[in-house]
Regions:
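NAD(P)-dependent Rossmann-like dehydrogenase/reductase catalytic/cofactor-binding core
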Residues: 186-309
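Rossmann-like NAD(P)(H) cofactor-binding subdomain of soluble oxidoreductases
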Residues: 33-109
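Conserved beta-strand segments of alpha/beta enzyme cores
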Residues: 25-27, 72, 94, 140
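NAD(P)+-binding Rossmann beta1-loop-alpha1 motif at the extreme N-terminus of oxidoreductases
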Residues: 1-40
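Internal alpha-helical scaffold of NAD(P)-dependent oxidoreductase catalytic cores
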Residues: 15, 88, 94, 109-201
Length: 309
């Protein structure tokens, strides 16, 4: 098996490195170099490109004459189906989407692909080879016939990028609580991995832990008070996250409904307070801006400016 990857960004580099470790011959070509001018020597062509690049690149490849008839072409975009490569259908053995549900954050530090899932959907031969490729990377190929790729990609982004955003706030909260900032990510990484393990092994609702699950309104109230004093900008996110946990906690049933109701009241009160503070802050900024405009056009200011001329 020979693989040609067009696109040397985070995904392309990570896939190339992982494939080479498995002894697979890989050619990695940066997208900035454009479509090759000579015949591609590969049975699988992977387009590791941005969504907006796929249609024009597919069209260029289709008319370039460099795609072997025996090759299949796949793309790694999560929100786009195989049909975005439609111009290539007549010049190769098949097209497919091959999206790894993995977070690629760096050009140099690659994520572990093992046990990751890959959504594969397209023409039969392209699906077959994409599945083979995924298995060589020790990943699990999946195909959902009626998949809405936009919703699928939104779910992946919500979890991957939402978790990163939550962790960033967590770093700030640890820092204002006495943890050296450089140490905070090292502490949160294993925590996130344990959450991932729980989600995979237990599913929901059982993967939820913490004071909301236990119905501990007192603990949540103390945390809200601390956030309000030391990191008020994080309070709306903290409260919204807590409210999202409530229905999960209700499904688990560890805490009495009365305790969960108390938790809900504490969170809703905090959310209203955060909203009121935001409105006051916004109003203050508007008033300050209006004041500056009024002052800048006052007679004394105008007189001073004229006197300088």
């Amino acid at each position: 098996m020979k693989v040609f990857i067009l696109g040397a960004g985070k995904v392309g580099r990570a896939l190339a490195a992982a494939l080479k470790k498995q002894g697979i011959k890989v050619t990695l070509r940066p997208a900035r170099k454009g479509v090759p001018t000579t015949k591609i020597d590969a049975s699988i062509i992977v387009l590791a490109l941005r969504d907006r690049q796929l249609p024009p690149v597919a069209a260029d490849l289709a008319t370039s004459g460099v795609v072997p008839r025996r090759a299949v072409v796949v793309h790694n975009a999560g929100s786009l189906p195989a049909d975005v490569l439609e111009p290539l259908r007549g010049v190769c053995a098949g097209i497919a989407q091959m999206h790894p549900m993995i977070s690629f954050a760096s050009l140099d530090v690659f994520p572990t692909l093992t046990r990751g899932h890959v959504h594969v959907k397209g023409d039969a031969e392209a699906e077959k080879r994409a599945r083979t490729l995924a298995k060589k990377l020790h990943m699990t190929p999946r195909t959902f016939a009626a998949l809405d790729t936009v919703g699928y990609h939104a779910a992946a982004g919500l979890v991957a990028n939402g978790a990163a955003a939550l962790a960033a706030i967590g770093v700030e909260l640890l820092a204002v609580s006495g943890v050296p900032r450089a140490e905070a990510p090292k502490m949160l990484g294993p925590l996130l991995r344990s959450v991932a393990d729980n989600v995979e092994a237990l599913g929901f609702p059982d993967a939820l832990t913490g004071p909301v699950r236990r119905g501990d309104a007192g603990a949540i109230g103390r945390q809200i008070e601390l956030l309000g004093e030391r990191l008020p900008e994080a309070l709306p996110l903290f409260v919204t996250s807590g409210l999202a946990q409530l229905p999960i906690a209700e499904r688990i049933g560890d805490a009495p409904k009365t305790d969960l109701a108390k938790v809900g009241k504490v969170l809703e009160k905090a959310l209203r307070g955060a909203g009121a503070r935001a409105r006051r802050a916004s109003g203050g900024k508007k008033a300050s801006s209006a004041g500056r405009r009024a002052t800048s056009s006052s007679p004394s200011r105008l007189h001073k400016r004229r006197s300088r001329t």
